[in-house]
């Protein structure tokens, strides 16, 4: 960067005072300060963006290396399983696929279904009554109509 010492800054200030004048110098100094601040923030933003992109590239490389390692492990497991399958078929005289049909693929994940109705029905009635759980649902309008005082009829 530019090497600015106190003597150079004082010289620049004196020249600016002579050229610009004492009336406009404070306004110019504020403007220069705000512009330098904006430039500094812009440079910091650019640095942060460059650092983020570099980290993103590093993460991508790391992800690729982990995926490659996972593929290598999967391939080694498959080759080991196929070698075991061959040796098993040689010793027993039959393949495991003949003995267990339909079990070649991995089992599919099924999301366990929540049994909230069963849990709700398992709560005792005395507990529901004491804790204030409503057992009979009623709409808001029906509740208002039920508890609204009836107008007295004049004959």
Swiss-Prot record:
Gene3D superfamilies: 1.20.5.3310. The chain crosses the membrane at residues 1-21. Residues 81-103, 131-155 are annotated as: Disordered. InterPro entries: TatA/B/E, TatB. One of its GO terms (biological process) is protein transport by the Tat complex. The Tat system comprises two distinct complexes: a TatABC complex, containing multiple copies of TatA, TatB and TatC subunits, and a separate TatA complex, containing only TatA subunits. Substrates initially bind to the TatABC complex, which probably triggers association of the separate TatA complex to form the active translocon. HAMAP family: TatB. Residues 89-98 have a biased composition (Polar residues). It holds the Pfam family TatA_B_E. Keywords: Cell inner membrane, Cell membrane, Membrane, Protein transport, Translocation, Transmembrane, Transmembrane helix, Transport. Part of the twin-arginine translocation (Tat) system that transports large folded proteins containing a characteristic twin-arginine motif in their signal peptide across membranes. Together with TatC, TatB is part of a receptor directly interacting with Tat signal peptides. TatB may form an oligomeric binding site that transiently accommodates folded Tat precursor proteins before their translocation. Its main location: membrane. Belongs to the TatB family. It comes from Polaromonas naphthalenivorans (strain CJ2). One of its GO terms (cellular component) is TAT protein transport complex. It comes from the Bacteria. It is found in: Cell inner membrane. The keyword Cytoplasm does not apply. This is Sec-independent protein translocase protein TatB. One of its GO terms (molecular function) is protein transmembrane transporter activity. It is a single-pass membrane protein.
